[in-house]
Amino acid sequence: VFETMTDLYELKAAVLAAKENCDKPIFTTMTFERNGRTFTGVSPACAAVTLTGLGVDALGVNCSLGPDELEPVVSEMSKYTNLPLVIKANAGLPDPNSNEYNIMPDKFAECVCSLLKYGVKVIGGCCGTNPDYIAKIKSEVADREYQPQTKSVDTTVCSSTTVVEINGPRIIGERINPTGKKLFKQALVENNIDYILTQALSQVQGGAEILDVNVGHPEIDEKKMMVRVLKAIQSVCDVPLQIDSTKPEVIEAGLRYYNGKPILNSVNGEEQSLATVLPLVKKYGASVVGLALDENGIPKTAEGRFEIAKRIVERAEAVGIDRKDVYIDCLTLTVSAEQAACRQTLEALHRVKTELGCKTCLGVSNISFGLPNRELVNRTFLTMAMEQGLDLPIIN
């Protein structure tokens, strides 16, 4: 049991430590203020999304406030998880003169019982409670049955403070990537984190709801740089991040040090990629982009890409990853070189949405590489892709 936590990063470390050293059930509870957030700014939604992804057995709230003030917190948590919830509230607040708490056992039990409808399974008391409170709760719930939650939970990713629900198109900012960017490459080599942060802030100000983070460069230690950049961006931006790398050691470092539930970009249909990357996605509770390519490269046909996408989804589900956390990228090829490929990409995207029921992702800007009027080409293709069901365009 990890309780009275205010920092999601610290709680993530505790959960990973437990999972890596034992196989016991894990219960986690955080402490929230009257503003609905922890002392470090964590929302109930971010806590629920992150901890559910990490695979805890129950989560909830302890200490904090009296049970009469906890309904907004418990309700918000319940929206983002079907796990059993835990409530161990204070007996209200202490009187500054007598130091006695202001909620008596009868009222405490009444308030707690009003929260059972949100999927609360574990009930207790924290500051100001005593055996009389627990006895009263027990008598009130003796004839009640636990009401497990079976609702559909939206696909979500989060930072420690902001949840993004993937229930419509969500823009992923593409500029934190050295490909074709001389100044960005120079910033990586010179360890110029300020330049990278400027790019991140610019993307958020331009409307990005998620940021792709790629720091791959042959002249640097990509693993160390990924951790450094993730921490730096999370210190100034509250949007969720997408960790972009092909190297397993970089992927794991990024997933381990990220605060919240990220997207991993990416896994593909190659056996080595499936066997290496998917277990990491499961362990760290992330979502993952699945690229529709394999050992034979990128199929020229929509059918070929769809079959790889289907294989990725099946393998993900085999290791315990819900298909709602798999975002298929049917791959955008440069239209100047592969003019027929655009149609195949859109057809594959449509099939993934309608037949697999998965969210979709595309690097939109690839379509116009080497062409004039890139913005016009990009937005035209983006419109066509969204018409076919694109959820996550990666764009500037």
What residues fall within each predicted segment?
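Domain-level signal for soluble alpha/beta catalytic cores
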Residues: 1-329, 333-396
